């Protein structure tokens, strides 16, 4: 069980929270914020070295899966909040996007 889930359950919130594994954000969703060129390079692990260094993480399939899942979770959480009044992404807050870089 992930640490945030254990923390929430330990605080007696088990019956108040719904945890879900998000669907990864699609290419179409990602290019609503980032340029198509940047997204293609990120997804194919072909970012220029300078940009990869700026992000601060080594390019890898694991990083791509993590980031598109985080974005997907934020989008799904926002939709849930619109429908139900409240939501939060326990993995969010680490992504600060610009159109042409991470």
Where does each model-flagged region fall?
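HDAC/HDAC-like amidohydrolase catalytic core signature
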Residues: 1-102
